[in-house]
Structures are given as C-alpha cells and as structure tokens.
C-alpha cells in the first residue's frame, strides 16, 4: 500500500477494517514497548506515568462509545501532538517524540478537545534514538558535499578562465559542467541564505532594485548566449569563484541532520526539478536544463542511497517505490543524452516534457515521505 | 434484458443497506461529522453512500459541480495498479463520507506532508460521488496487453468512431482510467480529484481534466431541466434516477451482455463540446428555437405549452436537435445524460472558451451514444458547436463491502 506511517495504517483500519482485506496494517512499529492508554467516554488510563525522552509509542484503545481523540499537552496547554478519529472498539499506535518535561495526556470522547487527563513526567534527552547508521549517513553525506563543492570550484575555475579570455565557444562548453556539483548539493548551499542568490539568481527572479547587483552563473549565461560576448565580465567570474570559496570555508562548521537536511534536502532537489527544470525556466538562455536536472536527481539519489538501509527497515514499501521512481527518471533522462551531456531543452517537445514531468511527480511524491520514514 | 428487473424496491433497498454499510464502516471515525453535516447543512451537504450494487454518480440526483479527470497508467505492473485502486477506494470511501484521506490533513507527523491536502476541511460531504471508468487503452495499448486483461475487454467498450465535424484534440481525449467527481461544492470535487491524483503518482498521471461549473441535466422526475450555455433546456427526456425499469434496460450492463465483470456497471461517454457562444448570441430567437425544436422560455417542444409535454417530432424542422436526438428517431435508444457547462476563461481570440462537457451513461455505447450521435450528423446545432475532446469508459459495478474499484475486473 501507499507508504503511509504506521499511524495512518491504524487509522485506515479503523475506518474500513473489512473494506479492504489486502490493506490490513502491517503494523509492527509500535508494538514493542508501547505505553498502553485506555480511553472510555469518561476516563483516560495511562499504563506508565514516568517516561523517558525520545520516540515513544502510545497504544491508545478506545473502549467507549464515542469517537475519541488523544492529545499530548504541554505545560502551557498547547498541543504537542494529537491523534484524532479513534473509533469505538479500535486501537491505534501513536508515536510521539517526547522532550523532557511534564505533560498532560488527554482523552477526549467526542473529540471536543476536553476530557479526562493524566499527568506524565518525561526525563532524559530526546535524540535521534542513537541510530549509528544515521549518524554515519550524515557524516558520509557531509564528505560527499565537500567533494561535490570542490568539483564545482575546479570546473568553475576553467569556466571563468574562458570567460576572462572572452572565448565564448569554450565558455559555453564549460558553463553547464561547472554547475553540476553545485546543483547536486544545492539545498546545503541554500542553508547559507546569502550565497545562493549571489551565485544562482535568475534575472527574472530579481526585484527591480536588485538588478544592479545581479551576479553569478546566470548573468554569464545570458551574456554568453544572448549577447554573444563576455567581454569585461571577468569580475563576475572572479566573484562567482570567491562566493563558492566562501561556501567551502563554512562547510567544516556545518552539521547536517538526516531528517531535515538530508531527507528534506532530497525532497527540495526534486522540487527544484519539478518547478524549474521541467519547465525550462532555470536555463532560459543556454537551455542546458537537463544537465541541472540530472545533477538534482543525482543529489537526491545520493541522499537516498545513504539512508536506504534505514528506510528499507522502517518502510520497505517506500524503499521499493523510491527505487522504481529513481530508475524511471534515470531511464527517461538517458533518452535525451547527447555526447557527454544532454540535448538542448528547447528541442525537447511537449510530449517528452510531459513524460519527464510525470516521472518527476512519481518520484517526488514518495520522496516527500522520506523524512518521516527516517524520523520514525 | 434477461435478468429479473430490479424494480423500485430493490434499488431502494440496496441503496439503504449500502448506506448502512457505510455508516457501519465509518463508525470508527468521523461518523459524528457526517451526522453533523446532515443535520446542519441540509440536503446539499449530505453524504451519498459509496458502497452498493452500482457506483454512485450515475443514477444519483445530479450535483451542481463537476471535476472530471482522465489518467494514463504509467506503470506496466499489474500488482502496483491494483494496489493503487485499493488505495483509491479507501480514499474515495473516506472523502464521499466527508472525511479526510488517510491520517488526515493536520495532527500527523510534523516532518511528513499530511496525507490529506486539507482544502476540504470543515466542508460537509456535499453529496460527493466518485465514479471510476476504464478506457479501451487500459485493456490494450499499442497492441500491448499490459495488465493481462485484453481478453476481458467488454464488446460494448468500442472505440468511438469519427463523427462528422469532430475536431478531437489528443491531449483532451482518451485515457486509461477516468474519474468523475460530482459534488454540490466545487472545492469538494476538486479536492477529491487532487487527492486521487496525488495518491496515484507513480502509477497514473493526469492526461486531461475538466471542471464543470453548472449541471445541464436532471435525473429527478418533474424537476426543471437546467439550461445550457445556449440558454436552452436540452435533454428533458432524461432517464430518471427512480425509474429502475428504464435504468435496467438502458443504463446498467447485464450479466448476459457479454462481459460478466461489468454486470451492474455502465458505460460512460464523455465529450468536450465547445460552443461558439458569440455567433450563437447573434442568432435570432426564431432560429435558435427552430434549431432546438423547443421554445427558449419554457422549454416546451414545438406546438406544446410545457417543457414536459410530449414532443410532436413531425412539427419540428427536419434538422431540429430534439427531433434528431429523440428516442423515436433512434429506434428507442436512450442514454442517461449528466453533462455540465464549462468556461475555461477565453481562447486568446477574445472568445469564451466555453461549452458543454457532455457525459452520458448507457448500457451499450453502440446502441446508445453512437446511435444517437450518428443521427446528429445533420443537426442544425452543429453550426454552433464542435466536439473537441472525447472518451469512452467502462464503469464497473459498485464496490461491495470488502471490495475495491475494479475488483470484478482484476479478480
């Protein structure tokens, strides 16, 4: 079934237990060590009130006659987490990442937000659950980012040399390859808000007052393809290199977490493809969009490959869907290969673009679920 | 029809037991919301039972709005397709009951996108119906039997022939699977298609879709026929949702029709009919009325006083629309019409991009739509319309408890 969380499986089971026998829950996540919570129309019994911080599974059973709602409330009364629609006679596993503190566990029969509650105390610190594989994935990913950024800097140097020599043909040839490393790790670069606009802004995205400060790859792209000359543009090349070096100097102090930076970054890379590359907006003059497209996909694939052992264990169906999704996009891209690169995107017709867009959507949807699978 | 005629009571009875099944199944979640919507929002907010012998959205009182979508299946993996159809069925059962998809739109895991997209939160079920159909290309595409169902293609699911005047756009025609979403609230209909499309990513891709803003047909006996964008009531002699005898004879496929898995199902023909609004509006009232064979104000047939007075075809012009489309001119052929008006802005030449999204259900398109449409070759109305999109789909019987959309085909 669709790679929904164990929670969703439990929810569906309550709705249509017998509607679809094939989709009963392969619900194994919360079974071990779950805290039992028994709700009736006027009571809320919790099996354990001294809890340890971190990922905690509550097994909430509704023995009342009304649809119930389970809430974890912070001391200020705000909701930390809630699970709605727990039908009479059903039971759901609900996973919450608990920080240290005191909380109210509330059962609301009729889902009014009010009802009996129990106080619980949580001690310790919530972390990544100590999964060494994730720590290693994050370390490996950081090493990958460093290598890819070095690659972009090396190739950009050659590109800038050609720009400075006003060798238009050579610069055009080196333009797209110089961007590949960057496009592969773009979400990491975007963590430093100031670098991305300097090196990768498109003219169409600028405010009128920003146009005088425009710099980066796309300025040179326009000069090369539209004006046919980069005479006097050498300073922009130097600045591009300096900005990339600044990014490099910041990497040592950077920590990347598996959920937001890696899984979230993979999703962002596919978003980049879906909104910028498939439409041909990114490389409006050079039409080298497919080179960026491939680099974005490669960047997402690298992240997935690093996280895959964990994903396979926590959501095998998601891993299968992602394997299939990546394979399909890669196969489609192959159709448009030309020499070391890709055909000009303005020669890719509407039907082929639709096919690419469909494949990107097909990959982007399961990819958006990667973070939850890793965080589980 | 050889099987026992269902009769009024059977459909009624099953309709009600279907309702109780849904209520039973929904008891776990959101039932209170359905009941709430029912009491507070009146008829337009009600939920239409999802389970039953026939799919809802065919012999269901016509809702105000439409979102129709045709999908291409992008995988060759039968298991994956079946898995999606099961997921769709779950989602459809939830949405038609006024509940969100999966784990809902809010309150889930913070780092995950919500299962439901959320724009229908707080809206009543709005009589949402979701009706699925399978196009000829699902059974065989480019000579390939992708899902091992080629042999199960119903004889009645023919490729529609070219009709004179057709100007069909491939990007607005065909599709392996179609879903008709009808609701009294357009946001509810759009939400339904959007969420199905999202669940389907990787298995299906939207090929084309169409919004309809106003119904042009009624299946409710005695109700006035809503006007189309030409200002006329057309299709007065529709099949009523209460007329089980006519439904059994002209709408529901039977066991002996050549395709067992379609028994209780129906065939949908969808046509995007562009109307040349501006030239029509310059046409004299007399000519407009002659073209339809009805008067514009009341909708009465030529020579009669009331919309539902029996038409005397011989009194109409030989090329009048009603005369050519009438069952008496087509060997008794009848179809259940469920079309909607659309306006997709303007066409770049300052003209309304508007028309009728025609939908008809029938027991067999060969003796239904194709028969009638062939008669319309000489229709005087053709000067003002053009068929630009087309699809034909086999809509399987309704989902029973424990089943899923298409289970009789993929079993």
Language-model-detected regions and their locations in the chain:
Chain A
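Bacterial signal peptide processing site
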Residues: 24-27
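Extracellular/periplasmic metallocenter environments
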Residues: 87-130
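Beta-strand cores of secreted/periplasmic/IMS beta-sandwich domains, seen most often
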Residues: 47-66, 92-108
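Bacterial N-terminal signal peptides that target proteins for export
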Residues: 1-10
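C-terminal motif of bacterial Sec signal peptides marking the signal peptidase cleavage site
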Residues: 18-22
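Mature extracytoplasmic or organellar-lumen-exposed domains after removal of signal/transit peptides
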Residues: 126-376
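N-terminal edge beta-strand
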Residues: 31-52, 154
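Beta-strand signatures of extracellular beta-sandwich domains
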Residues: 69-73
